[in-house]
UniProtKB/Swiss-Prot annotation:
This is ATP synthase subunit beta. InterPro entries: AAA+_ATPase (IPR003593), ATP-synt_VA_C (IPR055190), ATP_synth_F1_bsu (IPR005722), ATPase_a/bsu_AS (IPR020003), ATPase_alpha/beta_chains (IPR050053), ATPase_F1/V1/A1_a/bsu_N (IPR004100), ATPase_F1/V1/A1_a/bsu_N_sf (IPR036121), ATPase_F1/V1/A1_a/bsu_nucl-bd (IPR000194). It is an enzyme of class 7 (translocase). The lineage of its organism: Bacteria, Pseudomonadati, Pseudomonadota, Gammaproteobacteria, Enterobacterales. F-type ATPases have 2 components, CF(1) - the catalytic core - and CF(0) - the membrane proton channel. CF(1) has five subunits: alpha(3), beta(3), gamma(1), delta(1), epsilon(1). CF(0) has three main subunits: a(1), b(2) and c(9-12). The alpha and beta chains form an alternating ring which encloses part of the gamma chain. CF(1) is attached to CF(0) by a central stalk formed by the gamma and epsilon chains, while a peripheral stalk is formed by the delta and b chains. The gene is atpD.
Length: 460
């Protein structure tokens, strides 16, 4: 193995000099022995003259020029397979849950090529989530990619935790969760939530949280994806959850500046589209198995035209947009039914009844949005009888789109509800057709199926 020595350290970027005939390849892993600590670097650029520029996967505190560095002659490799289930690992696949070695039988490199075009498959099967607004307005496909878009504090992580709970409890596949640059507290909550729901033995957890250096946060999504690819290649249907894809982009921005690249729009890295593409093209289903991915996407300053969320949009099959305005009304999940879209919402895929109900709900809510201005200026009395009916039904629908979550029982005090797609369609169709015009609108708030709303109305 070739050895080199550190010649420059700038934050997370470390330059290492090797003999001219033994320069490491790009993406090779290097190891630095710094006292008792072991630090892994990943080669990013060859600068010439035997010098390579690398990114540190851990803290570069205590590094100094002249330290010996060993070329491991392979990319970063992580454990894969069933041994990783129920365990918490870092970007290098090392356990961080104090439960001893992973005991894996196989390790895979985190840099892999995407499946070829002829290996890929697409399915039209729907994945029922038990969340009314998602199943009705933006249904998920098995093997599809879903983005949860929202600003700070509108409920991306809670929605994701509910999806994992529902899918793990109702559909018994394996899941991989990659925590990319999020709060350590959320990682802890997530672990305990999975343990309490008895689904921890079906989930592999990989964390590179906010306190980690940018190199770590940039690669941890690939670590999680590699574990998911192994399950897929064994012929399983696996779920991959990434929270948060924006932090992956942000880590790339931090690294890009340190590597000396010119920034592009809004200060993002010039390689933004390519970095996103490398990750997203690997998240795909093949003829052997499928990866269904759910990705939380932070939207800076609630601006969906920001380059980072805008680049992510292009890769997704379904987009769930969380709205601050809906959250401020106390309606959770705060999904915007007019902004959220899905490729699956097609009569040939979901059936005519589902399609007509979803479009009918959207047109009623859209009409209500238009009438809001008139109501604000002139009041309800100036509306025609027909418009008054539209407003009454829309307000009931808006409240019926809310739902108590299992993972939020602690906050809401009401037990979580799983609503089947059949019940969801029946409920909204009933409201649209005027079957429940006699019920007060507060009966529809925070209930599961329509029967619960009818029961609640009796108590009001």
């Amino acid at each position: 193995m070739a050895t080199g020595k550190i010649v420059q350290v700038i934050g997370a970027v470390v330059d290492v000099e090797f003999p001219q005939d033994a320069v490491p390849q790009v993406y090779s892993a290097l190891e630095v022995k710094n006292g008792d600590a072991r630090l892994v670097l990943e080669v990013q650029q060859q600068l010439g003259g035997g010098v390579v520029r690398t990114i540190a996967m851990g803290s570069s505190d205590g590094l100094k020029r002249g330290l010996e560095t060993v070329d491991l002659q392979h990319p970063i490799e992580v454990p894969v397979g069933t041994a990783t289930l129920g365990r918490i690992m870092n970007v290098l696949g090392e356990p961080i849950d104090m439960k001893g070695d992973i005991g894996e039988e196989e390790r895979w490199a985190i840099h892999r090529s995407a499946p070829s075009y002829e290996d890929q498959s697409n399915s039209q099967d729907l994945l029922e989530t038990g969340i009314k607004v998602i199943d009705l307005m933006c249904p998920f496909a098995k093997g599809g990619k879903v983005g949860l878009f929202g600003g700070a504090g509108v409920g991306k992580t809670v929605n994701m935790m509910e999806l994992i709970r529902n899918i793990a409890a109702e559909h018994s596949g394996f899941s991989v969760f990659a925590g990319v640059g999020e709060r350590t507290r959320e990682g802890n909550d997530f672990y305990h939530e999975m343990t309490d729901s008895n689904v921890i033995d079906k989930v592999s957890l990989v964390y590179g949280q906010m306190n980690e250096p940018p190199g770590n946060r940039l690669r941890v999504a690939l670590t999680g994806l590699t574990m998911a690819e192994k399950f897929r290649d064994e012929g399983r249907d696996v779920l991959l959850f990434i929270d948060n894809i924006y932090r992956y982009t942000l880590a790339g921005t931090e690294v890009s500046a340190l590597l000396g690249r010119m920034p592009s729009a809004v200060g993002y890295q010039p390689t933004l589209a390519e970095e996103m593409g490398v990750l997203q093209e690997r998240i795909t289903s093949t003829k052997t198995g499928s990866i269904t991915s759910v990705q939380a996407v932070y939207v800076p300053a609630d601006d969906l035209t920001d380059p980072s969320p805008a680049t992510t949009f292009a890769h997704l099959d379904a987009t769930v947009v969380l709205s601050r305005q809906i959250a401020s009304l106390g309606i959770y999940p705060a999904v915007d039914p007019l902004d959220s879209t899905s490729r699956q919402l097609d009569p040939l895929v979901v059936g005519q009844e589902h399609y007509d109900t979803a479009r009918g709900v959207q047109s009623l809510l859209q009409r209500y949005q238009e009438l809001k201005d008139i109501i604000a200026i002139l009041g309800m009395d100036e509306l025609s009888e027909e418009d008054k009916l539209v407003v009454a039904r829309s307000r009931k629908m808006q409240r019926f789109l809310s739902q108590p979550f299992f993972v939020a029982e602690v906050f809401t005090g009401s037990p979580g509800k799983y609503v089947s797609l059949k019940d969801t369609i029946r409920g909204f169709k009933g409201i649209m057709d005027g079957e429940f015009d006699h019920l007060p609108e507060q009966a529809f708030y925070m209930v599961g199926s329509i029967e619960e709303a009818v029961e609640k109305a009796k108590k009001l």
